[in-house]
Amino acid sequence: MRKLLLIVILFSSFFSQAQTKLYVHPDGKTYASNTKTIAILPLKVQVKLRPKQLKDFTTEQIIQLQKDEAIDIQKAMHTWFLTRKKRGSFDAKVITPARANALLKKADIDVHELDAYLPSELGEILGVDCVVMGTFETSKPMSNAASIALGALFGAFGTTQTAVCNIDFYNTADDELVVNYFKKIRGTIGSDAQDMINILMRKVTRRIPYTN
């Protein structure tokens, strides 16, 4: 009985620490095979600090922290895709974050308010077949500036962190959602944005039609 109870507890603990949901369009492989260029855009980031941490920051500082986090994650995802490309599991061209953000800025689009635009509108400006966008929530900011600031105020973070990532791959020709990847993880998610992306995207590479 004790062994059974222990197994149930361990299973429940594992399930609460990591939850993954993946949607792939029935014609996902066709969409992916027709994709020649991809743009990875800044995610909509929300950093959920504890009340003790929040009181030492202004609203403007929190907003800037989230914007910095979004750019860091965008760059980390770009690197992740380039690594897949180098390994031969990814063929499409990925435009750089600097180019994507500059083109959007030139079109008077705030890169942190992309949910106000259709993927087709963004795709036309960027000249890409697919845009990657979504949301990200975390209890621990990964950007260097934020980590240094919070570390100075409150000391090192504990090992337990929470992150919820919801990433969408849209075909820009018809605004079709080709892939939705949702992952919630509780535990150690790395020391920077690149570590975090590697952990969040682990084991899903071969299940996404763009990278299998």
Residue spans for each PLM region:
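C-terminal/domain-edge helix-coil "capping" segments
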Residues: 19-49, 125, 136-147, 154-212
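Glycine-rich, flexible loop segments associated with nucleotide phosphate handling
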Residues: 62-71, 153-163
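Charged helix-capping and loop-helix junction motifs
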Residues: 116, 151-152
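Sec-dependent N-terminal signal peptides
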Residues: 3-14
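Histidine- and/or cysteine-centered catalytic micro-motif in compact active-site loops
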Residues: 3, 97, 136-139
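N-terminal segment of the mature soluble domain
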Residues: 44-46, 50-133, 172-183, 203, ...
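A generic structural signal for short, solvent-exposed coil/turn residues
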Residues: 10-12, 32, 86, 159
